[in-house]
Amino acid sequence: MQSTSQLSRPLNGNLELTLTIPWSRVQKAYDSAVDEAVADAQLPGFRKGKAPKDLIEPKLDRNHTLSHALGHLLPEVYATAVKEHDLKPLLNPQIKIVSGKEGETWTFTATTCEAPKVILPEKLKALDKLVAETKVVIPDLLIEEEANHRLAALAENVTTLGMTIEQYLTTKKLTAEELKAKLAQEAKSDLVSEFTLLEVQKTKKLPDRKATLDFLQKLV
C-alpha cells in the first residue's frame, strides 16, 4: 500500500497537504533506522557494527528511533505529493502529526505556499497607485516567515546597540504582540509590492527589477 495525499487551498493563501502513510511503510522506515543504529553500535566483545540486532534493538529509545525514521520518510512522501499535485513551494513545509498509532495508518499535514496569483488592473500606473488596485492574496505563511526574519534582524540590531528587546519595546511604547503585528503588516505591504513588480516585469517582459521600477515611474 502506497502513501496518499490530498491538497487543500485555504482562503489565507497557504497550501495544505494531508499525507497518509500506511503502517507498513512506517514500519519499514523504522526497521531501516534500527539497522542504521546497529551498524553504528559498539558493544563489549564485538567490533563496531557487528553486535547482533537482538542485543542492540532493546537498548534503543523506540520513540527516538521512530522520529529518526520519520525524518527520512516524511521528506520522501512530501516530495512525491508536491510532484503529484504539480506544486512549486516557496517555503519548506510546516509538518504536524494528525494521528499516529503503531499498527495503524499515520496522517500528517504539511503546510506551505506558492507564489500568489497577481491580477493587475487593466491600466498600469505608478507603483503606489498600482499596488492599491492590484488583487493579490499573500499567503499567511509567507507573511509570517518575512515578519520573523524582520524580528530576528531587529533583535540583532537592538543587541548591537546594547539594549534588550524588552527595553526597545519600552522606548517604543509597544507590547511584544503589537510589535509582531506591526512587522507582519509591514511584511505584507512589502510583499504585495514585490509580487506586483514581478507580475509587471513578467507581463511587460522587462529584464529586471530596476527596469520595472523605471517603467512604472514614467506612468501617470
What are these regions (language model features)?
Residues 80-81, 194:
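Short alpha-helical functional segments enriched in proximate histidine and acidic residues
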Residues 2-73, 113, 122-220:
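Extended, charged alpha-helical "arm"/coiled-coil substrate-binding scaffolds
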